[in-house]
Amino acid sequence: MNAAVKRDADTADATPRQAPGPSMLERAFAVIRALSEAQPDGGRVTRIAKAVGLTQGTVHRILHALIAEGVVEQDENSKLYRLSVDFFALAAQAGNPSGMRTLCRPALLRLCASLGDTVFLLVKSGFDAVCLDICEGPFTIRSFTGDVGGRVALGVGQGSLAILAFLPEAEREEIIRFNVPRVRGYGVLDEVYLRTEIERVRQLGYAGRNSGVLDGMAGVAVPVLDRTGVAVAALSVGTLAARLGDDRLPMVVELLRRQAEAIGPQINPFDIALRRPVGGMARVMSTDGVN
């Protein structure tokens, strides 16, 4: 090797390698997430670009690639971009892992009719709980997960706490370590509080009622356990605090338990869709409310 080549090689070796940027697939999903959080009538390229940290030109190219695939559409008049009906059809098909939503839907309908309150079905997804289904009652409430598909860190809200408390110990500890910085964002939650609540839920068999995060709201949830006693979902009631006093709470818990116990034996214990590891689920969400 001559001296000039050697100097070039030494210089190349000494130069720190830059970390690769996000792939086109990652950028596309970032744009899809931004669209999902946009106003109902859609979003503009400028706002989407700001939300995802990409140039307007890059976002424009991604949007038109997504339009070509049929998952995004652009309004001819407003020129706003939004997720298409085809996208939601795909999401609906994928949003029923192991037939869990189909299995639990009758229970949600019965509970909503019996209680007159909003009932949620939550399932675990990595470090989060995801709202898989809702049966809405007559009272206007706010929830941690919002609508179907909404996410919240495991440990925040009654439904996600009911799931977290009945996970295997090693998995539970990993989730607690990862989520403690996230739950602190709610002001009243820290690791001591979280661990105390988990132990309380394990002793009582349910999570409730007023988290203290939102005045005037309350909730209660029970885990849906598989045949090994591990939580795969939670049934949760969200309502006004005045409707979940000491006199009514035992009845609500009992109705939730009956439905959860009826669902549990029907769950396939070998279904890998319900045993996904937590690794890699590091996206932080910010929501507020009950359930």
Q: At which residue positions do the language-model features occur?
A:
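Short amphipathic alpha-helical signal-transduction/dimerization elements
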Residues: 36, 160, 164, 168, ...
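Amphipathic alpha-helical effector-binding/dimerization core
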Residues: 78-178
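Amphipathic alpha-helical regulatory segments at dimerization interfaces
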Residues: 34, 51, 102-114, 120, ...
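Short, solvent-exposed recognition segments
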Residues: 2-11, 140-215
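Signal-transducing coiled-coil/dimerization helices and immediately adjacent hinge/linker segments
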Residues: 272-291
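N-terminal helix-turn-helix
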Residues: 2-98, 102, 261, 265-269, ...
